[in-house]
C-alpha cells in the first residue's frame, strides 16, 4: 500500500479500549477508533487518555486510523 495517500491529523486520546485501541477526538471534532502503529508498540510507548497524538487515516475509511506519534 502506498503511503502517499494517507491523511495525517492531530487529535487527543479520549478513551482506552481493549486490544490497544483508542477513541481519539480529532481537531475538527470527529471521533475515530485508532490502533497503535508497530514502532510505538515495539518501543513500549504508553498512550494514556489526554495525550495529544498524530493519527494517520486512509481516505477510504475515515472512521478508523493509526496512531503514529505521541507528543511529549
UniProtKB/Swiss-Prot annotation:
Disulfide bonds: none
Keyword Protein biosynthesis: yes
Residue ranges of domain S1-like in the record: 1-72
Cellular compartments annotated: Cytoplasm
GO molecular function list: ribosome binding; rRNA binding; translation initiation factor activity
GO cellular component, as recorded: cytosol
PROSITE patterns assigned: S1_IF1_TYPE
Predominant location: cytoplasm
Keywords associated with the record: Cytoplasm, Initiation factor, Protein biosynthesis, RNA-binding, rRNA-binding
Family that this chain belongs to: Belongs to the IF-1 family.
Assembly description: Component of the 30S ribosomal translation pre-initiation complex which assembles on the 30S ribosome in the order IF-2 and IF-3, IF-1 and N-formylmethionyl-tRNA(fMet); mRNA recruitment can occur at any time during PIC assembly.
Known role: One of the essential components for the initiation of protein synthesis. Stabilizes the binding of IF-2 and IF-3 on the 30S subunit to which N-formylmethionyl-tRNA(fMet) subsequently binds. Helps modulate mRNA selection, yielding the 30S pre-initiation complex (PIC). Upon addition of the 50S ribosomal subunit IF-1, IF-2 and IF-3 are released leaving the mature 70S translation initiation complex.
Name of this chain's protein: Translation initiation factor IF-1
Protein's gene: infA
Amino acid at each position: 500500500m502506498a503511503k502517499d495517500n494517507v491523511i495525517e491529523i492531530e487529535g487527543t486520546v479520549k478513551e482506552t479500549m481493549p486490544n490497544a485501541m483508542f477513541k481519539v477526538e480529532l481537531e475538527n471534532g470527529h471521533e475515530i477508533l485508532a490502533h497503535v502503529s508497530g514502532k510505538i508498540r515495539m518501543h513500549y510507548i504508553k498512550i494514556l487518555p489526554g495525550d495529544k497524538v498524530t493519527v494517520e487515516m486512509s481516505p477510504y475509511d475515515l472512521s478508523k486510523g493509526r496512531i503514529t506519534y505521541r507528543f511529549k
